[in-house]
């Protein structure tokens, strides 16, 4: 007779992200973002791209994994960010998920040490404060182009916030001794506190200010 699973395998009582941080007490205050921030308990935030071909499938990807995926981005290539073209500057983690995984884990440890809070909760606050509610789009009428203010969908708000958090970390550690993990931790903490030093928070304010002037 086969032994039960609890005797054959080690099954933890509570699944924690990176084996350290629980998501049970993590709250999302923004009602529009709440359905799109996946916080199901898991040890390893890696979905193996199962949702890649499903419409809106990325809404089911764990929020920490989505941050890891943004950390792997190559940086701005066709425009300057922070006054620099940063493409290939972070080649050591471009498309290398395990390295990005370790970077985010180290950043979370720094956040926990500095804030004495659950770093996942701090990340959620940073996302809520960095997600623009309004943006502008270009429309053509009578051969003339106009800028018009539009509402931003919740999924795009989440995408923009994560992208700017990762990009802000890249700017902070551009050609200096600050490691990417340290820069990422500083960016997340600053965005969570609505600090103007945060690139993501400042970018959100800029986007909404331009949209307001285009009404």
From Swiss-Prot:
Keyword GTP-binding: no
The entry's keywords: Ribonucleoprotein, Ribosomal protein, RNA-binding, rRNA-binding
Single GO cellular component term: small ribosomal subunit
CDD domains from the UniProt entry: uS7_Eukaryote (cd14867)
Keyword Ribonucleoprotein: yes
Pfam entry (one): Ribosomal_S7
Molecular functions (GO terms): rRNA binding; structural constituent of ribosome
GO BP: translation
Top-level taxon of origin: Archaea
Signal peptide from the UniProt entry: none
Similarity remark: Belongs to the universal ribosomal protein uS7 family.
SUBUNIT field: Part of the 30S ribosomal subunit.
Role according to the record: One of the primary rRNA binding proteins, it binds directly to 16S rRNA where it nucleates assembly of the head domain of the 30S subunit. Is located at the subunit interface close to the decoding center.
Protein name per UniProt: Small ribosomal subunit protein uS7
Organism the protein comes from: Thermococcus gammatolerans (strain DSM 15229 / JCM 11827 / EJ3)
Originating gene: rps7
């Amino acid at each position: 007779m086969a032994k039960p699973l609890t005797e054959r395998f080690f099954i933890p009582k509570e699944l924690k992200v990176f084996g350290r941080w629980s998501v049970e007490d993590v709250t999302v205050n923004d009602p529009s973002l709440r359905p799109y921030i996946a916080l199901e308990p898991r040890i390893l935030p890696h979905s193996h791209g199962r949702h890649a071909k499903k419409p809106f499938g990325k809404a089911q990807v764990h929020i920490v994994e989505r941050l890891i995926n943004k950390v792997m981005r190559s940086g701005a290539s066709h425009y300057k960010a922070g006054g620099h073209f940063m493409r290939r500057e972070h080649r050591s983690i471009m498309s290398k998920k395990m390295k990005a995984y370790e970077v985010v884990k180290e950043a979370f440890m720094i956040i926990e040490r500095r804030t004495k809070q659950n770093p996942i909760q701090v990340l959620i606050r940073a996302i809520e404060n960095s997600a623009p509610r309004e943006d502008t789009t270009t429309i053509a009428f009578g051969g003339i182009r106009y800028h018009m203010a539009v509402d931003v969908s919740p999924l795009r708000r989440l995408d923009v916030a994560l992208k700017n958090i990762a990009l802000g970390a890249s700017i902070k550690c551009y050609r200096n001794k600050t490691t990417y993990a340290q820069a990422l931790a500083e960016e997340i903490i600053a965005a969570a506190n609505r600090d103007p030093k945060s690139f993501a928070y400042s970018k959100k304010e800029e986007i909404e200010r331009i949209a307001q002037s285009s009404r």
